[in-house]
A protein has these predicted regions:
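Pepsin/retropepsin-fold aspartyl endopeptidases
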Residues: 1-99
Length: 99
């Protein structure tokens, strides 16, 4: 997953959502997502938990959408996960800290 501090939601691909049994195709909650081709309404589902960077968050709302294969990214870690932590990005020294 790529870190995206400009994304309101964490994003997972359809294949992952379906493998987790989340049934995005019947989700009644939708979010607007800006893509290269315009604004799309995408399903919002709740993931039981996400663990990354040694941090765990339960009941995370995520959007379900596939990124282009050439992006080589399988999802985005957005604010629905990151808002639970203090995030420090130090570009000059090349490090990221989540606490």
């Amino acid at each position: 997953m790529a870190l995206d501090t400009g994304a309101s939601y964490t994003m997972i691909p359809w294949e992952t959502a379906e493998a987790l049994g989340l049934q995005p195709e019947i989700s009644t909650k939708k979010a607007n997502m800006i893509t290269a081709s315009g604004i799309e309404k995408v399903p919002v589902v709740t993931v039981d938990s996400i663990r990354t960077f040694g941090k765990l968050v339960n009941n995370v709302e995520v959007i379900v959408h596939d990124l282009p294969p050439k992006s080589h990214v399988d999802g985005l870690l957005g604010l629905s996960f990151l808002k639970h932590f203090k995030l420090t990005v130090d570009f000059r020294n090349g490090y990221l800290e989540i606490e």
